[in-house]
Amino acid sequence: MAILKGRFIGETLYSEGLRMQEIAHRSVSEGNPDQVILLEHPNVYTLGRRGDHQDILVGPDVIQKLKLEIFETDRGGEVTYHGPGQLVAYPIIDLRRLNQGPIEFVRKLETLTTSLLSTYNILSLIHI
């Protein structure tokens, strides 16, 4: 039976959440149980490898008013917004132990999330 350790952190700066993920990744890589980190971030836009500052569709006045942080990351993707009230889950899981690839795992997470939201009468869609 697989063990998954979960931690709810609360509101955390994106950089600190990233540091927590790196620590969790090292632990899981050493054979320790998989982890999921649940937290919220203050207003932040993350720019992934395919992102560009031009993809941020709010002006400097809004960025200043909302105290938006812009954080460049080496992760995939383009631009993502995170903010207060948005629960973010970071699964740190050794997929080899589950005999799954990343695409299959992400599809299962999407299905799980859609199912969970439907129990709260929240409609969600998966775009492939």
For the regions a language model picked out, list residue spans one by one.
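N-terminal, positively charged, Ser/Thr/Ala/Gly-biased leader segments
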Residues: 1-47
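Generic structural signal for residues in well-ordered beta-strands
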Residues: 3-6, 70, 124
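Short alpha-helical functional segments enriched in proximate histidine and acidic residues
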Residues: 24, 115-123
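Structural motif
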Residues: 35-37, 69, 86-87
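Short, His- and charge-rich active-site/binding loops that engage polyanionic ligands
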Residues: 41-42, 47-80
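DPxDG-like acidic metal-binding loop motif
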Residues: 84-97
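Long, well-ordered alpha-helical scaffolding segments within enzyme catalytic domains
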Residues: 104-117
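Conserved small/polar residues in nucleotide/adenosyl-binding loops
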Residues: 126-128
